[in-house]
Amino acid sequence: MIVDHSQIPEDTAVGQIAALEKDLFGRGAWSEQSVRQEFHAPARTYLLDIEGDAVQTADPVVRGYAGYWYDGDDAEIMTIGVGRPYQRQGIAAALLETLIVSARRQGAKRMLLEVRVDNVPALALYERFGFTRMGLRKRYYQPERHRRVHHEPR
């Protein structure tokens, strides 16, 4: 079930997202403080995929999360992550589709994102949704790691 991050206790969302970040992204993971700052930053939208109707329980389980920043013309995807046990079940696609719909409702003319060139599953997902490559930022993550910049067709 996809919900706005505000529908579950903030400490729960922050803690679970930070734990997922650490597992998924290692040294590049967002800390709890970074997640909390993103939640409170202006013009941000964050969505969570939670297990079942867990929003009604005391301990909802966050399976995946995604967010974007909208500046009045473009929306930029800040992050998408899905816990390893829940990957390859369509959660990332559902989150991405919901982000795109939300950004368009706000008036975004296009959606931008950046992704590591070696993140093959993410690249396939974005291409399936019609995102195209705009460029390459060399050594963005580390000296040997590059990142592609994509945008959704208008």
Placement of each model-derived feature along the sequence:
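Short glycine/proline-centered loop/turn elements that form peptide/ligand docking sites
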Residues: 96, 119-122, 139-144
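Conserved beta-strand segments that form the floor/walls of ligand-binding pockets within enzyme
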Residues: 76, 81, 112-114, 135, ...
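Conserved catalytic-core motifs of GNAT/GCN5-like acyltransferases
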Residues: 33, 114, 132-148
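Residue-level recognition of the GNAT/N-acetyltransferase active site
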Residues: 83, 87, 114-118, 143
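Acetyl-CoA-dependent GNAT
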Residues: 1-89, 96-106, 154
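Conserved GNAT acetyl-CoA-binding A-motif
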Residues: 103-114, 137
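Conserved active-site tyrosine of GNAT-family acetyltransferases
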Residues: 21, 126, 131, 151
